Amino acid sequence: MSKILKIAIPSDDGVTVKTSLCSSRGYVVATIISVVIVHQEMRWNLLSEIMTACDGRYYNLHDCTHVIFHVISERRREILTGKGIEVLLTDNNSVNVALADFLATASAYEHAKQIA
């Protein structure tokens, strides 16, 4: 049985990777099974949720396994890894290219596991 991965990327428009987590209007969240994107959605950061949810600005990441950023502070990295979310970095501005890079890496990893 394949593991389900949920990858979040901060974005204001669903197309461009946002450089700052704090000012991001939301996240593109992709559900991946067997190195294939089976669902993709935009989750908006609503002020009401940020102000009232237990996790504040991280409420949209509650079911995510990975987050892809341009830059992240050590403190935010610690918070996310403490929640069990793996933090990855990209130098791509395109959400689709960042996801494709992730899938290529995941595919190579799965292939290496099968050979070993």
Q: Where is each model-derived feature located?
A:
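Non-catalytic interface/targeting segments
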Residues: M1-G56, H62-D63, G82, T90-A116
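Short helix/strand-capping connector loops at secondary-structure junctions
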Residues: E78-G84
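Glycine- and other small-residue-rich loops at beta-strand/loop junctions that grip anionic moieties
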Residues: F69
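Short, glycine/polar-rich helix-capping loops at beta-to-alpha or helix-loop-helix junctions
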Residues: I72-E78
